[in-house]
């Protein structure tokens, strides 16, 4: 690095603690963060300020290292700065940072996706999962001529006004409107029901079916805990929706390319009309997309009348890092290995935890996702079934692990993730640390 370029780098944070930086941040940013859950408001305390990451490890401003099970809330399925993906990113930096034009990199990623997902006949890239959902729902309204959108209590689909109604973890415990500043007209056409109740869905469609443009659901709800749904329930609600001419949108921003190349749609054998993706498809860069039936995507401008655009959509870093990530995941056959490793890890963690505390915990896992929660007599499929005291109990577990260098997402309603970098030696190290840490509870 030349002296000239080094002058452009600001390192005013060096020598400061997380506590000091948080106080500075609160002066210039709302709550000191740029996404609410990062503030530690769900678990209490001061958020840790991280400055670097590699593999399964985060390093904070003081130089302390942590094994990371948050992984930027899901995108980093290969771990931080996977060497092969990093090589692609460095090469991209020498080519272009942004075009705002047609380019071949988005073509390659789109072809990769459509070649592996039969129902993804066309793809449109955007910059986030929220944008993907917003755009997909606009398409459903244009295609059906209907106004209403039907979602489920506890499923989070981004921070667009119409769907911030009984949403996910960052809103857990807040008012029923979920956010100030949302007009009544914005949510007037949003219908909401609890998960895991086919009869309620049937009754809703009997009265409103002809007005519902889209049924949107996370087929693996993972924003208010890990609420694994019955396949029978998912099959039935799709059947009901299709009977009434309602388009089915699967929000696979988290589960897409996390549960396998075809996501939950493939595992369930369900062909949704539209699917939204994000997180993993960008390889750690801000990317989202919506994909699905050719006739529906052809409604999007410039092919059709549905307008959607974005200055940084299909940015070369996200396209190339995303493609490299997916190619490596496919080449190394990571999914089955990660599924077994995740279940083994989560079960062992709970076994250690239950041996050190009078509270009984259990692990819920799916693919490479996990969720620690208070033990219940029945499967938890709805938010009203989450046991009382879970949030407070998780906060205690979170802080004792954080103190000992294990970083979970800072909310009892967020899920955890394993990456390809969480190999057997990393897991063994974490279990050894946790065994000692839980004695502090």
Swiss-Prot record:
Question: Which reaction does this chain catalyze?
Answer: (S)-4-amino-5-oxopentanoate = 5-aminolevulinate
**Pathway membership of this protein?**
Porphyrin-containing compound metabolism; protoporphyrin-IX biosynthesis; 5-aminolevulinate from L-glutamyl-tRNA(Glu): step 2/2
EC class of this enzyme? isomerase
Q: Which PROSITE patterns match?
A: AA_TRANSFER_CLASS_3
A Pfam family recorded for this sequence? Aminotran_3
Its BP terms in the Gene Ontology are:
protoporphyrinogen IX biosynthetic process
Where can this protein be found? Cytoplasm
- EC assignment: the record states 5.4.3.8
Q: Which GO terms describe its cellular component?
A: cytoplasm
Tell me, what is one Gene Ontology molecular-function annotation carried by this entry? glutamate-1-semialdehyde 2,1-aminomutase activity
- Where is the major localization of this protein? cytoplasm
Q: Which cofactor does it need?
A: pyridoxal 5'-phosphate
Query: What keywords are assigned to this protein?
Result: Cytoplasm, Isomerase, Porphyrin biosynthesis, Pyridoxal phosphate
Q: Which residues carry this modification: N6-(pyridoxal phosphate)lysine?
A: 279
Q: InterPro entries, alphabetically?
A: 4pyrrol_synth_GluAld_NH2Trfase (IPR004639), Aminotrans_3 (IPR005814), Aminotrans_3_PPA_site (IPR049704), PyrdxlP-dep_Trfase (IPR015424), PyrdxlP-dep_Trfase_major (IPR015421), PyrdxlP-dep_Trfase_small (IPR015422)
Assembly and oligomerization = Homodimer.
Family to which this protein belongs: Belongs to the class-III pyridoxal-phosphate-dependent aminotransferase family. HemL subfamily.
- HAMAP family per the record? HemL_aminotrans_3
Q: What is this protein called?
A: Glutamate-1-semialdehyde 2,1-aminomutase
Species annotation:
Leptospira borgpetersenii serovar Hardjo-bovis (strain JB197)
């Amino acid at each position: 690095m030349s002296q000239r370029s080094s002058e452009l780098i600001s390192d005013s944070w060096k020598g400061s603690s997380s506590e000091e930086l948080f106080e500075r941040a609160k002066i210039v940013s709302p709550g000191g963060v740029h996404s609410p859950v990062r503030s530690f408001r769900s678990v209490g305390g001061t958020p840790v300020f991280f400055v670097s990451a590699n593999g399964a490890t985060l390093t904070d401003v003081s130089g302390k290292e942590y094994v990371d099970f948050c992984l930027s809330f899901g995108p980093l399925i290969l771990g931080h700065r996977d060497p092969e993906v990093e090589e692609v990113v460095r090469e991209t930096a020498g080519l272009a940072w942004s075009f705002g034009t047609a380019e071949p990199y988005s073509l390659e990623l789109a072809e990769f996706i459509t070649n592996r997902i039969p129902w993804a006949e066309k793809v449109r890239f955007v910059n986030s999962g929220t944008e993907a959902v917003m755009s997909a729902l606009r398409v459903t309204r244009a295609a059906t001529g209907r106004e209403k959108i039907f979602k489920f209590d506890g499923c989070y689909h981004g921070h667009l006004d119409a769907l911030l109604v009984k949403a996910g973890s960052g809103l857990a415990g807040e008012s029923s409107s979920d956010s100030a500043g949302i007009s009544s007209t914005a949510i007037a056409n949003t219908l909401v029901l609890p998960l895991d109740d086919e009869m309620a869905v049937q009754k809703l469609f009997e009265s409103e079916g002809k007005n519902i443009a889209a049924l949107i659901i996370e087929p693996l709800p993972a924003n208010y805990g890990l609420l694994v749904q019955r396949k029978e329930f998912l099959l039935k609600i799709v059947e009901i929706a299709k009977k009434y001419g309602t388009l089915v949108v699967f929000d696979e921003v988290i589960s897409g390319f996390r549960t396998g190349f075809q996501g939950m749609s493939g595992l369930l054998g369900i062909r949704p009309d539209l699917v939204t993706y994000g997180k993993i498809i960008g390889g750690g860069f801000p990317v989202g997309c919506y994909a699905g039936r050719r006739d529906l995507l052809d409604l999007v401008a410039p092919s059709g009348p549905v307008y959607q655009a974005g200055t940084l959509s299909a940015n070369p870093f996200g396209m190339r890092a995303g493609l490299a990530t997916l190619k490596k995941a496919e080449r190394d056959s990571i999914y089955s290995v990660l599924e077994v490793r995740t279940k083994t890890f989560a079960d062992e963690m709970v076994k250690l935890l239950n041996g050190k505390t009078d509270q009984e915990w259990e692990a819920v896992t799916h693919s490479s996702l996990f969720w620690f929660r208070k033990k219940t007599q029945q499967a938890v499929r709805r938010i009203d079934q989450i046991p009382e005291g879970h949030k407070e109990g998780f906060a205690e577990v979170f802080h004792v692990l954080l103190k000992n260098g294990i970083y979970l997402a800072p909310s009892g309603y967020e899920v955890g993730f394993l990456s390809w970098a969480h190999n057997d030696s990393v897991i063994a190290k974490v279990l050894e640390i946790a065994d000692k840490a839980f004695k502090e509870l």
